[in-house]
């Protein structure tokens, strides 16, 4: 693990959701399902299963179960995995990571299997300081343990870190851990019922850098 002298203007560590904050997995899910409506229904059922399953169950198993539950054929999960290495990167994501690299350690905390999570993380072309998947943590977000594992591996308290979410459900977990959170709400989802309000929210990534560099963003 690399050791980086912290910049006074930034937190020591910035953690990211991967599949919705940095990568456009929506497009691949929708394509595998055959339409946006079918893809959203499939994704919603998958999320329901992950948030209710407790200890980790294989990601691929939950994806298949969700497809069956909403009436999709077995070819849909197969198409999703076939398109995995073509997950689009959101515009501005690589530029943001490059701008942060001199100032912060960077990590990913993702609801995914180890196999697919590390493959997806590699698409950004970043030398990540930590990549934590739900399989490695033993639980799916928003359980606190995946975020806590990433912070522990970087030997950094939550007070000296920040999180960039792609889902409003991350806010439940980051609040418990004490991570300041920017919600990159690219597709305009409603805040989940009962979820804490994020420190900042935008449909774009351009606001992340000034938010992190703002006075008071770094630990005192």
Predicted features, each with a name:
Residues 25-29, 87-90, 128, 183:
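Tryptophan-centric aromatic hotspots in well-structured domains and transmembrane helices
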Residues 2-47, 71-72:
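Active-site neighborhood of HAD-like aspartate-dependent phosphohydrolases
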Residues 59-64, 77-108, 118, 122, ...:
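Short, acidic loop-to-helix structural element flanking the phosphoryl-transfer center
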Residues 27-36, 66-71, 97-101, 120-124, ...:
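Alpha-helix C-terminal capping segments
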Residues 34-38, 71-76, 101-104, 125-127, ...:
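Short glycine/proline-enriched coil/turn segments at helix->beta-strand junctions
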Residues 28-32, 41, 65-66, 79, ...:
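Alpha-helical elements of Rossmann-like donor-binding domains used by nucleotide-donor carbohydrate transfer enzymes
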Residues 1-14, 98, 109-220:
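Asp-based, Mg2+/Mn2+-dependent phosphohydrolase catalytic module
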Residues 35-36, 40-44, 48-81:
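A metal-dependent, Asp-based hydrolase signature
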């Amino acid at each position: 693990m690399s050791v980086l002298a912290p910049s006074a203007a930034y937190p020591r560590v910035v953690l990211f959701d991967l599949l919705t904050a940095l990568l456009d997995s929506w497009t691949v899910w929708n394509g595998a399902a055959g339409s946006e409506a079918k893809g959203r229904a499939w994704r919603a059922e998958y999320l329901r299963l992950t948030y209710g399953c407790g200890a980790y169950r294989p990601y691929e198993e939950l994806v298949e179960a969700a497809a069956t539950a909403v009436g999709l054929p077995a070819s849909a999960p197969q198409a999703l995995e076939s398109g995995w290495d073509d997950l689009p990167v959101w515009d501005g994501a690589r530029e943001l990571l490059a701008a942060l690299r001199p100032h912060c350690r960077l990590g990913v905390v993702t609801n995914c299997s180890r196999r697919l999570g590390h493959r997806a993380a590699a698409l950004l072309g970043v030398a990540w300081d930590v990549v934590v998947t739900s399989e490695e943590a033993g639980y799916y977000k928003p359980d606190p343990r995946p975020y806590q594992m990433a912070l522990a591996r970087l030997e950094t308290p939550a007070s000296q870190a920040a999180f960039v979410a792609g889902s409003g459900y991350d806010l439940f977990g980051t609040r418990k851990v004490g991570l300041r959170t920017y919600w990159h709400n690219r597709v305009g989802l409603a805040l989940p019922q009962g979820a804490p309000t994020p420190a900042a929210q935008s449909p774009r990534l351009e606001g992340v850098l000034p938010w992190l560099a703002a006075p008071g963003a770094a630990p005192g």
